[in-house]
Structure formats: structure tokens, C-alpha cells
């Protein structure tokens, strides 16, 4: 079992280390900081890209929906044509 004196010494060293050594700032390590005014608006570009992608998806979904509806109507008409004479459908 570890003696209480040893535990106290370890706790004291940890406390001193936490008090004396402050964490380094990430900005200092990264180098110079570019002011926000001179940076391109990444969020704006991402938003515009996502808007265009969403519009493309909406168009594709609409086209697929219209195509599916056309195919379903064709299939229903063929099924009716198999059961009934052609002149009664019009």
C-alpha cells in the first residue's frame, strides 16, 4: 500500500505544476492571425454551395417524381388495356 506521505508529495507536485505552468495558447503556436476583415467569407461560400446543391436535389426529385408518375400511369393503362378493348378507354 502507498504511504500517505508519498501521496501528499505527489498531490503537492501536481498542484505546483498546475499553478506554475499555464497552458500555451493555440493562436501563438499557429503563427500570425489574419484579421477577419481580410479573410474570405467561408461560411457565405459554403451556404451558397449548399443552396445550389439543394436546388439541384429539388429539381432531380421533381423530375424523378414526374417520371415515376408517368411510368405508373403507363403501367395502369397497360393493365387496363389487357382487360378491356382499346376503344372503351377513350
From Swiss-Prot:
Mind listing the GO molecular function terms for this protein? Answer: mRNA 3'-UTR binding
Tell me where in or outside the cell this protein is found. Answer: Secreted
Gene encoding this chain?
Answer: nicol1
Q: Which organism is it from?
A: Salmo salar
Provide the alphabetized UniProt keywords.
Answer: RNA-binding, Secreted, Signal
Name the Pfam families for this protein: Neuropep_like
Q: What is this protein called?
A: NELL2-interacting cell ontogeny regulator 1
As given in the record, the signal peptide range reads 1-26
> Gene Ontology terms, cellular component aspect?
extracellular space
The family classification in the record reads: Belongs to the NICOL family.
Amino acid at each position: 500500500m502507498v504511504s500517505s506521505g508519498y501521496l501528499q508529495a505527489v498531490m503537492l507536485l501536481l498542484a505546483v505544476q498546475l499553478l506554475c505552468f499555464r497552458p500555451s495558447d493555440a493562436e501563438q503556436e499557429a503563427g500570425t492571425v489574419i484579421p477577419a476583415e481580410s479573410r474570405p467569407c467561408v461560411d457565405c461560400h459554403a451556404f451558397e454551395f449548399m443552396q445550389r446543391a439543394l436546388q439541384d436535389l429539388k429539381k432531380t426529385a421533381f423530375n424523378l417524381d414526374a417520371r415515376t408518375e408517368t411510368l405508373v400511369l403507363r403501367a395502369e393503362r397497360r393493365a387496363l388495356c389487357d382487360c378491356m378493348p382499346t376503344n372503351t378507354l377513350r
